[in-house]
Amino acid sequence: MNASTSNYPHSVVTVPAQRLEVRNLSTSFSTDEGVIQSVADVSFNIRPGKTTALVGESGSGKSVTSLTLMRLLPRTAATRVTGQALYTNASGETLDLLQLPEPRMQSIRGNEIAMIFQEPMTSLNPVLTIGEQIAESLRLHKHMDSARALAQALRLLEMVEIPAAAQRVKEYPHQLSGGMRQRVMIALAMACDPKLLIADEPTTALDVTIQAQILELMRRLQIDTGMSILFITHNLGVVAHHADEVAVMYAGRIVEAAPVHPLFAQPQHPYTQGLIACLPSQQRKRAVLVDGKKRLYAIRGQVSSPLEPPPGCAFEPRCDQAIAACREVIPELSLDDDGRSARCILPRIPSGAVTQEVKA
């Protein structure tokens, strides 16, 4: 634990080593066709004031991981969750989110831990005004009266730089543009000053200009508040500029985890190497000739069906470096001396052997 002292005498604020520590998280669903293992033995940490990015293609288990952590999955016999999600709150108390009684989890969800969902149009209530939706959270968690809550909702809309906020606070979601709705989602998430923000593809449906504005807004809010962020995305270009740590997921498992700069400079897992090679800035190096014409590089094949996973490494059917042993065993996530980890039986790239610059 690290301790930092404030400007006030005799006041010491203890900063936890980890804001969230996820250990061996697994989530599966029983269906008529069989058991779907959406998340398998996932572990990662999020430090206070830092951003951890969870990266992977669609279907890799990123969103299910976030919904599991927030306890938003359907509570039925068909859903099975194991592992730990150890959250350290502002008082220094460490809580396993997966084991808390539901009333206690409700007091944390939307308060100490908030979430921005992928599609704001389906996440916002169409029959309530923007102001009413933000005020509801403030009344519930901060026990404000209606007048104070609405006044604070207006200040939050101004904080996320929504123009004419006094007018927008009285409007409904369908009256706002996609970029404005996403700013509303950020205001809603920030309403109760969360210590941890989970952002699930927060810029997917936005154009490049609005995307950059939203990401810059989130960065400034993080600097101002000191919150931690779990950033879920498939966009490695965004990750390169906005994350501190990266965990790469494939078929429900983390296949590589490292600080952002070493991961981009020396990707260890073939899947990570393939994702980086697909970036526009890398295409000139990896373009392939087909019938005399250059084609953009792409990882061949597609993710295997979760109902029929390969017997060994899940990435083996698509891997250009696979050997016979890859079809026989699921590799462990092995940790290097430098704190990096990768789930691959192939030899690691020596430190310093490869250096490449990655741009968005």
Model-derived features: positions:
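Charged, flexible cofactor/metal-binding loops and thiol motifs
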Residues: 93-94, 259-360
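Conserved ABC ATPase signature
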Residues: 171-176, 180
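A short, flexible loop at the N-terminus of ABC-type nucleotide-binding domains that lies
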Residues: 15-19, 28-41, 72-78, 89-94, ...
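A short, proline-enriched helix->beta-strand linker immediately N-terminal to the Walker B motif
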Residues: 191-195
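ABC-family P-loop ATPase nucleotide-binding domain
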Residues: 1-28, 334-360
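Short coil-to-helix "N-cap" segments within the ABC nucleotide-binding domain's helical subdomain
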Residues: 33, 79-86, 101-107, 129-158, ...
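P-loop NTP-binding/switch modules centered on Walker-like glycine-rich loops
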Residues: 198-202, 206-288
